Amino acid sequence: MAAVPSAVHLPRCVVSPTGRHSASLIFLHGSGHSGQGQREWIKHVLNQDLTFQHIKIIYPTAPSRPYTPLKGGLSNVWFDRFKISMDCPEHLESIDSMCQVLSGLIDEEVKTGIQKSRILIGGFSMGGCMAMHLAYRSHPDVAGVFVLSGFLNKASVVYQDLQQGGRMLPELFQCHGSADNLVLHAWGKETNSKLKSLGVSTTFHSLPNLNHELNKTELEKLKSWILTRLPGETDGQSE
């Protein structure tokens, strides 16, 4: 595992809760994007910010690094990959080092008084893949994981770790467009099926005719799921 300076600080965009903060959500963007860009994209789709009365949303930005699919060009990516395909090895050195960095972000929330069981991790595309590595390998005690248009490689170390058993398995919420021509729908479905076979409680929503993008239906389904995993302090709390 590559060493990561303890001083690494990820730029982030934060949407504060409208009421008392009692839970946190970390939303990881896709390759080449940014935390601010992810927030603005969601705001454009919903015609408003994704907000909650009690949940703080954190949109961090990945560091700029050489990215092999861009022939070594610099891009804001959570990790490197040899190509965008299920059928290749994972670039574990970069994945593991970023797990360390993002663990620091989780620790920051815990230090403010938020229990790990009140933290959700997820993301779009590469961000969803990163979230699965982070949660299932390093932080299995989080409230859940969400993946939008993402996948794991066929021989992912995530599967290898889960095969060992004896650990908590956060619930997985997954959405994928049926017309996705970058990250194929079949890749997302296969990832979901494999994790389910390893004991993960999963849901998978196919979005008809949706390419590699977000839509309102998807985000509304996500918001409903978030509230089942991170409910407010009272049953009658309005969102």
Swiss-Prot record:
Chain positions with N-acetylalanine modification: 2
Subcellular localization: Cytoplasm, Cytosol
Enzyme Commission number(s) from the entry: 3.1.2.22
Catalytic center residues: 125 (charge relay system), 180 (charge relay system), 212 (charge relay system)
Cellular component terms (Gene Ontology): cytosol
Reaction catalyzed: S-hexadecanoyl-L-cysteinyl-[protein] + H2O = L-cysteinyl-[protein] + hexadecanoate + H(+)
GO biological process: negative regulation of cGAS/STING signaling pathway; negative regulation of Golgi to plasma membrane protein transport
Gene Ontology terms for molecular function: palmitoyl-(protein) hydrolase activity
Highest taxon above the source species: Eukaryota
Family to which the UniProt record says this protein belongs: Belongs to the AB hydrolase superfamily. AB hydrolase 2 family.
Protein name (record): Lysophospholipase-like protein 1
Organism: Mus musculus (Mouse)
Source lineage: Eukaryota, Metazoa, Chordata, Craniata, Vertebrata
Gene designation: Lyplal1
